[in-house]
């Protein structure tokens, strides 16, 4: 969720600096390979790219009128020898496309799937300005939300 909040804040700040238009649209993408694993001790490795996406529209008053979040979590297995073991033709579905099949509900303290939590955050942002979103989402020094989950 840290990346999602950062994307919203960055997009709103950039869009808020543009000239007053009927609606201004933005798309932010943040990618990370931090979940990748090296092949070690004869075990296979995993290359993983997590791309977090936020699309939003801001009105002439700087209020968010539309907000959508998604994450593409692309995992590519490889052998200790470096050969790709993943199905190169397999479709990579985003977390929104997976819905309940993503499987976060059981690990969620509030019993919500990833897409439900992302949709709730997006709904929270609609109707607010950048300043209101920032003020309403308390975070620690690492950017993790410190308030109650949605």
Feature annotation, model-predicted:
Residues 8-16:
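Bacterial N-terminal signal peptides
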């Amino acid at each position: 969720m840290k990346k999602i909040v950062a994307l919203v804040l960055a997009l709103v700040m950039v869009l808020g600096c543009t000239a007053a238009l009927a609606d201004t649209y933005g798309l932010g993408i943040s990618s990370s390979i931090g979940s990748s694993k090296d092949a070690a001790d004869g075990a296979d490795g995993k290359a993983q790219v997590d791309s977090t996406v936020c699309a939003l529209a801001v009105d002439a008053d700087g209020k968010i009128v539309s907000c959508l979040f998604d994450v593409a979590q692309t995992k590519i297995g490889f052998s200790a020898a470096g050969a790709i073991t993943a199905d190169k033709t397999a479709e990579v579905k985003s977390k929104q496309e997976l819905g309940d099949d993503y499987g976060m509900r059981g690990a969620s303290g509030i019993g919500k799937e990833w897409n439900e939590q992302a949709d709730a955050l997006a709904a929270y942002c609609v109707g607010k300005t950048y300043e209101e979103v920032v003020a309403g989402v308390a975070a620690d020094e690492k950017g993790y939300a410190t308030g109650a989950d949605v």
